[in-house]
């Protein structure tokens, strides 16, 4: 059925549940699993200039952000390991999340995308998160949405 699934993660409880679900599915199907984290472009607002960013330096701040993102992917790897799956990880910066998810899924020949119904943005209820909705709208790859 499915041979390789991409699961996007932002470290939220919603996406951690999607990671666990994807790992169980991959385990039952004998499929590979790719964990993807996407960082949107970071813009420096004018009011931050001269503040903490200038004091610490942009490189130091970016290293801190990258360290946090590595921890986020490491936590997702722990979730997949608990389900008996050794997953691959990928990180991409500078793209909108939905575009990166679709692009990486195509480039890595994934035949399934797994996403949480909502990410860090929250808003629970009946509506899907905006990035999830955009992926559904713009891809032809099957998408499994986890609530």
Model-predicted regions and their roles:
Residues 3-56, 79-88:
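Small/aliphatic-rich secondary-structure junction motif
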Residues 22, 76, 101, 135:
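Aromatic/hydrophobic pocket-lining residues that form π-stacking "cages" and hydrophobic walls in ligand
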Residues 50-54, 105-108, 131-132:
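Short, hinge-like loop/turn segments at secondary-structure boundaries
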Residues 55-71:
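A short acidic, glycine-rich active-site loop
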Residues 112-137:
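Glycine-rich, Arg-bearing micro-motifs that act as flexible, cationic patches
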Residues 143-147:
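Short hydrophobic/aromatic patches at helix-to-coil boundaries
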């Amino acid at each position: 059925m499915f041979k390789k699934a991409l699961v996007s993660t932002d470290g939220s409880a919603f996406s951690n549940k999607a990671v666990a679900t994807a790992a169980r599915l991959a385990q039952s199907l004998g499929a590979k699993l790719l964990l993807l984290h996407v960082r949107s472009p970071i813009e420096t607002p004018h009011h931050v200039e001269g503040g903490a960013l200038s004091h610490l330096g942009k490189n130091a701040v970016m290293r801190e952000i990258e360290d946090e993102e590595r921890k986020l992917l490491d936590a997702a790897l722990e979730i997949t390991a608990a389900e008996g799956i050794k997953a691959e990880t990928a990180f991409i910066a500078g793209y909108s999340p939905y575009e990166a998810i679709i692009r990486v899924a195509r480039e890595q020949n994934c035949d399934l995308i797994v996403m949480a119904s909502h990410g860090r943005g929250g808003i629970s209820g009946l509506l899907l998160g905006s990035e999830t909705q955009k992926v559904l709208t713009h891809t032809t790859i099957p998408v499994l949405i986890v609530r």
